[in-house]
């Protein structure tokens, strides 16, 4: 359908994402400090190096991570994975991360550079095999190790560590590349037992976003004591339903890493898989990870819309997720959303070619597809397909109103079971091409 230029322009009004999504204050987990600097790796001289440090000595820390499935895994991914395996997820007390250079597809020299970053931090904290390393930026270029080494020495030498809000925000800034705002989330939680704890998360990513996972780095830290196997299970569950449920452009990076540190600074019994609080913490961590992951989509390169894809009443969770992902990754769906075109045929097409594990999950005679308004306007739901029957005479004016919203929902009811999955995606604009066409310049 063709819509008026006035309506299209209304949707594309500039949004101050920094003001909307960056917190102005917050409380943070006990026993963590962070440091940051501008090492000079980034050409514009902005912050590009950060360190997260566990300072709690009351009990050993635990760590877990989920890494990219890209075959060209970057040196930091391979190195950090080895550290975690050797340490068995215990006594990991630091994370060092740089932006501006991904240290990916850099061969043996890249592996050595990643190890040097780890060794430098290990030496500063006086512990072996206690640091994870992460990098993000341009692929296929070697790190400027003279600048990185000087930067690490500067952070520790000048005691540039803090636990206040500005320190955490600046570390979040130090990992940004094409991001338009730093992604920082912090929340306090209370367990049924009465124990209160804090989760703080940072992420970077705006493009090359597609499971599993994206050109994204994510860090979640907590002062709750969690046994290492339980922490890994918790993070894997949360990632499956958060960072692996987002899409900007369908590209999967070589550097994707989500890690979680638990330092046990809260004086309470360690949580394991058999603990009564385990399921509660797992669900709280999942909801928290979803909030953090959604910020990545909201910052999608050149995007003007945040779109929730809800697939419900599926036979299996996995198939609900596969269909939601297929819709979210479709370039034709994303460009139609940008153009505010109610072309539901593209949504059905994406559902139809989804590679389901069980073909019984999809019955073309039972499917319902709708656009859902998120601004409390009525009617909230606009049916596009009802019980497999296309609604050929939909209200085009109402469709235009819903598609003009900055936030909207695509709802798919499969009618074959009781399982559901959510995906978060964005539209695809001309600006995306501009950003990525000029990325290395």
UniProtKB/Swiss-Prot annotation:
Pfam families: ArgJ. The alpha and beta chains are autoproteolytically processed from a single precursor protein within the mitochondrion. Residues 1-8 form a transit peptide. The record marks 136-137 as: Involved in the stabilization of negative charge on the oxyanion by the formation of the oxyanion hole. GO terms for molecular function: glutamate N-acetyltransferase activity; L-glutamate N-acetyltransferase activity. Substrate binds at residues 177, 204, 215, 301, 436, 441. Disulfide bonds: none annotated. It is found in: Mitochondrion matrix. It catalyses: N(2)-acetyl-L-ornithine + L-glutamate = N-acetyl-L-glutamate + L-ornithine; L-glutamate + acetyl-CoA = N-acetyl-L-glutamate + CoA + H(+). It comes from the Eukaryota. Its main location: mitochondrion. Catalyzes two activities which are involved in the cyclic version of arginine biosynthesis: the synthesis of acetylglutamate from glutamate and acetyl-CoA, and of ornithine by transacetylation between acetylornithine and glutamate. Heterodimer of an alpha and a beta chain. This is Arginine biosynthesis bifunctional protein ArgJ, mitochondrial.
């Amino acid at each position: 359908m063709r819509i008026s230029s006035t309506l299209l322009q209304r949707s594309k009004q500039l949004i101050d994402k920094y003001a909307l999504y960056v917190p102005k204050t917050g409380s943070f987990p006990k026993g963590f400090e962070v440091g940051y600097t501008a090492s000079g790796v980034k050409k514009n001289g902005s912050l590009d190096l950060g360190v997260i440090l566990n300072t709690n000595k009351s009990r050993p820390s635990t760590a877990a991570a989920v890494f990219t499935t890209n075959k060209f895994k970057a040196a930091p991914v391979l190195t950090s994975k080895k550290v975690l395996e050797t340490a068995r997820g215990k006594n990991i007390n630091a994370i060092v991360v740089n932006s501006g250079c991904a240290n990916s597809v850099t061969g043996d020299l890249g592996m050595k550079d990643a190890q040097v970053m780890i060794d430098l931090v290990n030496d500063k904290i006086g512990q072996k095999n206690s640091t994870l390393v992460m990098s993000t930026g341009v692929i296929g270029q070697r790190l400027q190790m003279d600048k990185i080494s000087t930067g690490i020495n500067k952070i520790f030498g000048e005691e540039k560590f803090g636990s206040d809000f500005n320190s955490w925000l600046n570390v979040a800034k130090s990992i940004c590349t094409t991001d338009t705002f730093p992604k920082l989330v912090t929340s306090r939680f209370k367990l049924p037992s009465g124990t209160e704890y804090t989760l703080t998360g940072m992420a970077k990513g705006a493009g090359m976003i597609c499971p599993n996972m994206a050109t994204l780095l994510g860090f979640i830290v907590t002062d709750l004591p969690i046994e290492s196997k339980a922490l890994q299970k918790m993070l894997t569950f949360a990632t499956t339903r958060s960072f692996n449920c987002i899409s900007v452009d369908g590209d999967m990076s070589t550097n994707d890493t989500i890690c979680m540190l638990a330092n046990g600074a809260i004086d309470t019994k360690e949580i394991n898989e058999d603990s009564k609080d385990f399921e509660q913490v797992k669900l709280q961590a999942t909801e928290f990870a979803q909030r953090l992951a959604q910020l990545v989509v909201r910052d999608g390169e050149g995007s003007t819309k945040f779109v929730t894809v809800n697939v419900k009443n599926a036979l299996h969770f996995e198939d609900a997720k596969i269909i939601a992902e297929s819709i979210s990754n479709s370039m034709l769906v994303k460009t139609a959303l940008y153009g505010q075109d109610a072309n539901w045929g593209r949504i059905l097409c994406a559902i139809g070619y989804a590679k389901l594990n069980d073909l019984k999950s999809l019955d073309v005679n039972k499917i319902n597809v709708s656009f859902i308004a998120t601004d409390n306007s009525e009617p909230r739901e606009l049916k596009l397909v009802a019980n497999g029957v296309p609604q050929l005479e939909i209200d085009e004016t109402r469709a235009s109103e819903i598609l003009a919203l900055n936030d909207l929902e695509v709802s798919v009811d499969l009618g074959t079971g009781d399982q559901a999955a959510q995906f978060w995606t964005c539209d695809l604009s001309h600006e995306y091409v501009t950003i990525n066409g000029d990325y290395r310049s």
